Amino acid sequence: MNLIKDTDQEHVCIFGGDYIYRMDISQMLRFHKKREADLTVAAIPVPVSEARHFGIIEVDENLCMTGFVGKPQISPRTMPGQPYMLLASMGNYIFNRHPLEDKLQQDSQDGQSVHDFGRDVIPKMYPGGKVYVYDFSQNHIPDAQPKEAGYWRDVGTIRSYWEANMDLVGIEPQFNLYNQQWPVLTYNPPFPPAKFVHFSYFRTGHATNFMISPGAIISGAMVKKSVVGCNTRVHSFSHVNESVVMNNVVIGRGCIKYNSSKGVETIHLSQICNRKSTNENIEHICIIGSVCVSCNQRIRVYLK
């Protein structure tokens, strides 16, 4: 509360930190001001079949919030004019300062509250306040492709984190990091450029549909459809496919690291093994970080 009270700003923006998306927040703020809202919630359209995975917001024809259902088992009210689509909350909010202060103060004195925005604070605002929903799919980003509109990923699980990384490596990626009109700014570590070494028929550093970070060396190995972190070494005769390799990893000679994640219920977080002992039927998501693996080692970590 002190962070809000110590400022004289009229609006307070609260955005989730474990999501991936590209957004011009000023467009949402203009929407908020135009409707003179106390609260504006960002949402994405999702098919009715996916409702159980999200918190679903119900709205009227003016996008005024009329209800909220957390991960419903039956279909709630659909979007006006779109009978097969629902609005899923993104966890991004713009508040007017004074209504937010009032509701937080009330919530702090509620012994039954768990002090969660989605569960406790927002449901107390929309029945009597001016709460609107901003359709994120209408947010315009310069030079973005049509299929990028509304891209949003929750990366709060291992599977969703892996899927978001795989979204980056396509020829025409769903989330394009190469948009010079709207770059994604990040820290660049002081490592040299990535390097591919060895050139022979059976031993060539080779990679396709991949993203590789500074300081990485692909030494006579093959990397396909993967994201490779900084200061990583992949040694000769190793294969890395559909995987996320974190920073400072060493993969020894003759290792295979791959993914085949169709229809998986038990997720193997990582498996690196010698090619001769690989079970080709094993299906898993492959993520590895901060380890050194050599030939004939097998690592298997299960997600409970």
Specify the residue positions occupied by each region the protein language model found.
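Unchanged
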Residues: M1-E172, V264, N296
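Left-handed beta-helix
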Residues: R97-H98, D102, D107-K304
